[in-house]
Amino acid sequence: MARRSRLRRLLLLLLLPVASTSDAEHRLFERLFEDYNEIIRPVANVSDPVIIQFEVSMSQLVKVDEVNQIMETNLWLKQIWNDYKLKWNPSDYDGAEFMRVPAEKIWKPDIVLYNNAVGDFQVDDKTKALLKYTGEVTWIPPAIFKSSCKIDVTYFPFDYQNCTMKFGSWSYDKAKIDLVLIGSSMNLKDYWESGEWAIIKAPGYKHDIKYNCCEEIYPDITYSLYIRRLPLFYTINLIIPCLLISFLTVLVFYLPSDCGEKVTLCISVLLSLTVFLLVITETIPSTSLVIPLIGEYLLFTMIFVTLSIVITVFVLNVHYRTPTTHTMPAWVKTIFLNLLPRVMFMTRPASNEGNTQRPRPFYSAELSNLNCFSRIESKVCKEGYPCQDGLCGYCHHRRAKISNFSANLTRSSSSESVDAVLSLSALSPEIKEAIQSVKYIAENMKAQNEAKEIQDDWKYVAMVIDRIFLWVFILVCILGTAGLFLQPLMTRDDA
C-alpha cells in the first residue's frame, strides 16, 4: 500500500507541469480569441496596410501538360504578417512564446494564384498557423496548383519553357495589403527532382499594377519558372529510331535493282515514319502556330522517303529497258556511260571481247577439212562406180576445186564465206542445209548479244543514277539532320 501511494504521488508530480502548461495554453487561447473577429484586418488604424511577407517554396514539379498547356506544381506558400490582437506576455502564461491555432480562427490574406487553370484559386485553410507572442503570424499552407503556361514547342524535345506564377490579393488593394518578397527567388531547398524537367532558375518579382476595372493599385508577386526538358526519353524512344529509319532510305539506292525489294523497302520506311508521327501528335500541343522540331524532322524525312520512292520507280524503269522499247540517245551514252562514272569513281568491268582472241572463222577451221570430207563423200564416182582410193579423174577434179575454194574463203567475211560455201556445187544438199542452219543460229546469237549489250548499258545507266542519288541523299540526310537539331544550340548561344 505504501508503495502504491508513493507511485501515485510521483505520477502527480510528473503530470503537474503538463497540466500547468495545458492550462496556460487554454487560458491564452481563451484570452486571444475572446473578442477576436477573423474578418477584420488586424490593424490599429484603418488606413494602415497589412504588410505580408511572402515566399513560395517548390516541393515538386508534378507535370507539364503540353497539350492543355498546364503546369502542375506542389508548393508551400509562406506568409508572415503581424496581428496586434494576438500579442501576449509569455511570463503570464508559463513562458509560452508560441502557439499553434487553426487557420480558420484568425484573419488571413486572401492571396490567390491569378493564372490558375484548374481547381481552386485559393489555398485550403485546414492547416494551423504559428502565433508568436510579439503578434507575428506565420502560415505555411501546402497547395497543388495547376497554372496555365504558354508552352513553346518550337524546339521540342530540346525546349526551354518559361512558366510564370502570379500571386496576389484578390480583394485588397495596396492600401489595404502590401506584399513584400522574401528573398529574390523561389525557395528550392526542399525541391524533389523531376525526371522530365530541370529547373534552371526561378526568380521572383514584385509588381504594382493598375487594372482597367479599378482605380486602385494592386500588388502581386510573380515567379518566373525557367525549366528545361530532359530529352533523354525522347532521344532514345523517338529521335534515334527516326534517325535509323531515315538512314535506311539511303540504303534503298545501294540495293540492287534485280532484287525486286527497292520499292518495298521505301514503302516500309514511309509507313514506319507515319506511325511515329501519330505517336508524336499525342505528346505535343495541338497548336498551329509553330511546328515542333521533331515534327519538322519527321516531315523532312517523309518528304525524303517519298522522293526516294519516286526516284526508285524511275530507276527501275531505266533498269528494265530493252532495245525493243527504248532507244538510248547519244547524250545518255556520253553522260551516263562515260562522264559520270569517272566523277563517281565507278569502274565498269572490261568486256570479254577485248580480253579474248576473236574465234577463227568457220571457213578457216571447219571448212578446211572439206578435202577430207570430200574424200569420204567421193568414194562413189559420178558414174556410180566405187573409187579406188580417190584416184579417178572425177574425184581428183572435185578435190582440187574444193581445196582452191577453201583457200579463198580465208580472205572473205563469214557471211560471204557461208554463201560461197553454199554455192559450191560439190556439196551435197544435206550439207548445204546444215550450213544454212548454222548461219541462222549465228545471226540470231549475234542479235541476242547486241540486245544484251544494250540492256547491260541501260542497267549500268540505272546503276549510275542510283549511285548519284546515294551520295545526294547521304549529304541531304546528314546536313538536314544536323541543321535541324543544331538549331536549339545556336539559338541558346545567341540568347
From Swiss-Prot:
CC per GO annotation: acetylcholine-gated channel complex; endoplasmic reticulum; Golgi apparatus; neuron projection; plasma membrane; postsynaptic membrane; synapse
Phosphoserine modified-residue sites: S403, S406
Compartments (UniProt record): Synaptic cell membrane; Cell membrane; Endoplasmic reticulum; Golgi apparatus
Glycan-bearing residues: N45, N162
GO biological process, one term: response to nicotine
Membrane topology reported for the UniProt record: Multi-pass membrane protein
Gene Ontology molecular function terms on file: acetylcholine receptor activity; acetylcholine-gated monoatomic cation-selective channel activity
Sequence ranges on the Extracellular membrane side: 22-240, 276-297, 484-495
Record's protein name: Neuronal acetylcholine receptor subunit alpha-3
Protein's gene: CHRNA3
